[in-house]
Amino acid sequence: MKSVRILLALVLGLGMVQVAHAHRFAPSLLQVDEVAPQQYNMVWKTPAQGVSNVPLRPQWPQSCEVRSASEPQLEGTGVVTNWQLQCAGLGESGLVGQTLGVSGLGANQASVMVMVNLLDGRRYQQVLDTEHPDFVVPAQSTAGD
């Protein structure tokens, strides 16, 4: 009987390790790819479990219109959503000089990796957190050329 209890404790302990592996403090990812002038595919991946009822929500320029959006899909320990944006109101420079951000970072004690890939090959990466919840897309690449 004692060995059954020990075995049960080990199995439960391993189960808790698996639950802990789905870490709610893992950073989210916001990837923005320019696919045509003023057209962008946006991928948002965030942990399925949060620490708050306040959702994490990507933010983009108001002049960008959502052309299509996927339903959130469970993928591993995260939830993935895709959007296609049309940003004709931004002019020829597109997202350069524009602000991307995520709301809800403070309430969730979260961070987000933002990755922006433009048609001309410029690439940008920035970590957003409670102190820096926004990213202004610069004219010069920050990810090395």
Model region roles, listed by residue range:
Residues 1-6:
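Positively charged n-region of N-terminal signal peptides that target proteins for export
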Residues 21-145:
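Histidine-/acidic- and/or cysteine-rich, low-complexity loops and terminal segments associated
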Residues 7-15:
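Bacterial N-terminal signal peptides
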Residues 17-19:
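N-terminal signal peptide c-region/cleavage motif recognized by signal peptidases
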